[in-house]
Amino acid sequence: LDPRLLRGIQHRSEETQACLAVIKARDTLVRTRTRLVVHCRGMAKALGTRFPTCSTASFHRKAPEHVPLALRPALAPLLEMIEQITTAIRAYDREIEAIIDAKHPECRTLQQVTGVGSVTSLTFALVIEDPARFRKSRDVGAYIGMVPRRQDSGDSTPQLRITKAGDPLLRRLLVQSAAYILGPHGPDSDLRRYGERIAARGGKNARKRSRVAVARKLA
């Protein structure tokens, strides 16, 4: 065994784990609410009714008046549950803001980047925890699994998918931030132009590769 191949493992502190638990609990509620909203829309569509276009946060307010009479016994409890989940998500949002103000003020600096909000900045700070353990900033991209796999045969070097190592929640949040930066509402910036140059190369999944590249730059 060559000891030089080994690397030390740094465990997260109990306080960091507790703060991450708040973010992961919120993420579970957000995904649950999305599934409930999609289910309600699907049930109504089967009877020829469409709910108005709106955000998931406002769905419980705008949907009730459009529920078909035949579906009210089935959808009314779900709409009440969506409302309760929305209230709980807002409570988690306030808790996240309190954690940032009390323990992680550096997140406010991270939020200066367009598309990066409280949840993404705090998740990044908690997952990285100690930036000094990385020798260079490029190592962070590999740490959260946003660098391509390698498979060199000598004759060819195929382009493979990213490794998807590390924390999946942080990786998803960074990709969402990158999607906003590259989207129609994202203002002009170095990150946006960087992603547009990659997308302009064309090829299969060019837009998807550009979002991943911008997310890696964010990290």
Listing of model-derived features with the role each one plays in the protein:
Residues 3-7, 36-37, 89, 129-133, ...:
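Short helix-capping/linker segments at secondary-structure and domain boundaries
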Residues 9-12, 42-45, 53-58, 153-156, ...:
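Short coil/turn segments at secondary-structure boundaries
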Residues 14, 18-109, 190:
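Glycine-rich, often acidic, oxyanion-interacting loops/wings at catalytic, nucleic-acid
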Residues 32, 36-39, 120, 136, ...:
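Residue-level detector of well-ordered alpha-helical segments, enriched
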Residues 109-112, 118-207:
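Phosphate-backbone recognition surface of nucleic-acid-processing proteins
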Residues 202-219:
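Charged substrate- and nucleic-acid-binding regions of tRNA-handling and nucleotidyl-transfer enzymes
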